[in-house]
């Protein structure tokens, strides 16, 4: 579960960094 949360967290950060383009 920790791996899932970590991957999800990174994915969310990438989405925020790239905005709607990501």
UniProtKB/Swiss-Prot annotation:
Keywords: Host membrane, Membrane, Transmembrane, Transmembrane helix. One of its GO terms (cellular component) is membrane. Its main location: host cell. The keyword Membrane applies. This is Uncharacterized protein C84L. The chain crosses the membrane at residues 3-22. It is a single-pass membrane protein. It is found in: Host membrane. Belongs to the asfivirus C84L family.
């Amino acid at each position: 579960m920790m791996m899932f949360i970590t991957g999800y967290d990174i994915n969310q950060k990438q989405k925020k960094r790239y905005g709607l383009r990501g």
